[in-house]
Amino acid sequence: MSWKKQSMNRMPFIASFLLALASASHLAMADISTERQSELIYLLKQDCGSCHGMTLKGGLGPALLPETLYGKPKELLVTTILEGRIGTAMPPWKTMLTQDEAEWITVQLQQGVK
């Protein structure tokens, strides 16, 4: 069988895997209560805003707007939230946030925090 045919035969499997992965990520984020979501938005606007600007348009840290985050891998943003950035003022938040919460915050930032 040619390489192209082998690749085509794997496409349904790959598509199913990616769909399952996306669904699992969505379900994990859905477990964050409405109350906790409100707390996270407050944290984002107040704590993150103290460095990234109260409107998240930038300050000590870079802007956190959809257009400035466009194209950045979600995993990179989540890791930055949880682990911080060595050599910068960006602290790690892993003692205050779960992986799911960091993913939820990332989605909010990519969509534009309201």
Regions found by a protein language model. Name each.
Residues 3-15:
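Bacterial N-terminal signal peptides that target proteins for export
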Residues 66-114:
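Extracytoplasmic electron-transfer domains, predominantly the class I c-type cytochrome c fold
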Residues 44-54, 105-109:
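The canonical Cys-X-X-Cys-His
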Residues 14-24:
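Bacterial N-terminal signal peptides
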Residues 57-58:
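Short, non-ligating residues that shape and space the ligands of small metal-coordination modules
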Residues 22-27, 114:
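Hydrophobic alpha-helical membrane-insertion segments, chiefly the h-region
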Residues 26-43:
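Electrostatic cytochrome c docking/interface patches
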Residues 46, 62, 88:
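Glycine-centered loop/turn positions within well-structured domains
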